[in-house]
Amino acid sequence: MISARQMTSLLSSTVITLLTISIGHTAIAATEPASTERGAGGYVFASHDTEGFNTRGVAVEYLPELRNIDSLTGMRYTYRTYTQQNWQREAHQVSLLKRDIDPATANGWQLDAGMSLQGSHGMLTLDGGYHRPLAAKTGLDLFVDREWVETHAALDRGVHFIFAGVSVDQGLGDHWTVVGLAGRQDFSDGNSRDHYRAKVVFQPLLDSGLTLQLRYRTYHSDTNNVGGVYFNPANYAETLLAVGWRKRIQGWVLRMTGGMGVQQINSDASTNTHLLEVMLDSPSRGTQFVRVRGGYSRSASYGGPNYGYTYLQGEWIIRL
């Protein structure tokens, strides 16, 4: 249960969010055609891992501006539960949503900013991204994420992080693309990580939707011991071979990625990793929009090298 003080803080955030939306809506309405529609939606999330940690989330959304699922303004209230054996924790979050992304090119930006309360801890949350072309075959991505560290011990202590970085993608001819990413993750307990990732994508047949991918990621932590509060090796690296497939069916877009790789933690012997992801998006035009994501990964945690994580999430939006 949340305290009266926390509820007051949550309600204050709700009022501020509504005022921000109202002001922004009024300003935009004065400069844009009156054809902008309103909408409402919902969001669900569920995850489970092999250490018995479960996350469940349900959200409702009000959208005073709605063009499609990638172009909207609104607010969201989210209720989450975290459970592990006999332990349980509730979290409440109010967020301002803004998306302005071209579904044909993925150019644009999105922002989810708000406040989350769990246990006796409160935090301002942030999830944002920006993509723009730098040249005909060159793209730039900026991203930032501020969120709780989702383990039993970390939630009890209110540990959170902010992860920000930049990536660049470069097309090489018609069949090849290379991507590089660099980011920094700062934790509220004083720990920090430097992240580096690279990806090479080969498209053998341009109209098939099939891609072959080589992925590499590594991070380095400056604090070796965080007391088992979360998985934190000094050095981690993974190399993964993946196959991706994208198919458009009557406006619906289906994406699937599957891969296998190897990981190394510090100087330990390498072990196997697995990845499977499925994504489904409804047409960008219509009276309602659906977006579904699901996946499974097998990598490492402080419990050992065979940590498994499964998740499923979905968003449904309708015009009013």
PLM region spans:
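Bacterial N-terminal signal peptides
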Residues: 12-22
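Intrinsic low-complexity, intrinsically disordered segments enriched in polar/basic residues
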Residues: 8-9, 21, 100
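Short, intrinsically disordered, low-complexity terminal/loop segments
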Residues: 1-2, 320
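Gram-negative and organellar
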Residues: 28-320
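Bacterial N-terminal signal peptides that target proteins for export
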Residues: 2-14
